[in-house]
């Protein structure tokens, strides 16, 4: 068993203090000072134990003790120290010299504890909800959505923005220019009939003295060459239209014949025509072969 309390000894008085006992205790403390509480009962003749004398002086009789309601500043200190020190009321009272540990303990148990719980409950009710942290599943779904959206954006991009598409477009443009050049060369080839027409006109000057049949044949040749020039043009559209494949082959064939006639036998034909005109005979229809 533990040590028995001193108040349980025989001849020790319990209960509330009387005013006479308070006066005796205050007189002794003023004369000797607070400290040696074991000598107080023997020196003063009080029928109280040393602990009862100490608590009576500390909590009631010492000067500077403040009574009454606690200020908000004192309440804040008590709440803060109680959270740090716990229920060590004597240590808490050392930070509030004007308050006793007994008063602080009673005020905490009767007022502050209930008030603090009420404030915490109200704060929990009216506090804004905390943003929930995304779980692993939500993060994966969000990452999947972002990847899908990026793929969709790449798919929605125009095809001509890729290098392969640029090469295809370049090839198509090159083919188009090649076709245009081919058409230009073909048009120049079958427009060569105009130069042949000029040659026929030139030869017509030498053939003025010849007979009318030769003139008619030359006229037919000119009409044939001019017909070749007029056919490629569309009068309805008003623009140059490409001749069909068969006509193009015929025109290329005629152009080769005309080149041969113009390049190789022009001089020979002129000489023969001059001889035939001078001799009275005309063989102009040879130009048609």
From Swiss-Prot:
Gene Ontology molecular-function annotations: DNA-binding transcription factor activity; sequence-specific DNA binding; transcription cis-regulatory region binding
Keywords in alphabetical order: Activator, DNA-binding, Nucleus, Repeat, Transcription, Transcription regulation
Superkingdom field: Eukaryota
DNA-binding region(s) in UniProt: 37-61, 89-112
GO cellular component: nucleus
InterPro entries xrefs: Homeodomain-like_sf, Myb_dom, Myb_TF_plants, SANT/Myb
Sequence segments annotated as region (Disordered): 127-162, 225-252
GO biological-process terms attached to the record: positive regulation of DNA-templated transcription; regulation of lignin biosynthetic process; response to auxin
A Pfam family recorded for this sequence: Myb_DNA-binding
SUPFAM superfamilies documented for this protein: Homeodomain-like
Tissue: Mainly expressed in highly lignified tissues such as vascular tissues.
Known role: Transcription factor that binds to the promoter of MYB31 and MYB42 and activates directly their expression, thus repressing lignin biosynthesis.
Protein name: MYB transcription factor 69
Gene this chain is encoded by: MYB69
């Amino acid at each position: 068993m533990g040590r028995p309390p001193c108040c349980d000894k025989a001849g020790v008085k319990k209960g509330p203090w009387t005013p006479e006992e308070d006066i005796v205790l205050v007189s002794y403390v003023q004369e000797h000072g607070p400290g040696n509480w074991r000598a107080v009962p023997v020196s003063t003749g009080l029928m109280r134990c040393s602990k009862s004398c100490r608590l009576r002086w500390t909590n009631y009789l010492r000067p500077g003790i403040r009574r009454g309601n606690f200020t908000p500043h004192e309440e804040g200190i008590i709440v803060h120290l109680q959270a740090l020190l716990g229920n060590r009321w004597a240590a808490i009272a050392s930070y509030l010299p004007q308050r006793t540990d007994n008063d602080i303990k009673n005020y905490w148990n009767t007022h502050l504890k209930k008030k603090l719980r009420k404030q915490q409950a109200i704060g929990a009710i009216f506090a804004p909800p905390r943003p929930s942290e995304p779980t692993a599943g939500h993060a994966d779904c969000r990452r999947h959505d972002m990847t899908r959206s990026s793929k969709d954006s790449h798919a929605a991009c125009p095809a001509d923005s890729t290098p392969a598409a640029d090469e295809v477009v370049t090839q198509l443009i090159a083919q188009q220019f090649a076709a245009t050049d081919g058409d230009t060369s073909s048009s120049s080839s079958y427009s060569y009939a105009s130069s042949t027409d000029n040659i026929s006109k030139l030869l017509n000057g030498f053939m003025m003295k010849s007979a009318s049949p030769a003139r008619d044949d030359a006229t037919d040749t000119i009409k044939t060459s001019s017909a070749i020039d007029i056919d490629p043009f569309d009068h309805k559209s008003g623009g140059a239209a490409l001749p069909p494949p068969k006509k193009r082959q015929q025109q290329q064939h005629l152009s080769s014949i005309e080149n041969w006639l113009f390049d190789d036998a022009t001089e020979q034909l002129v000489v023969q025509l001059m001889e035939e005109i001078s001799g009275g005979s005309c063989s102009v229809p040879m130009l048609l072969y």
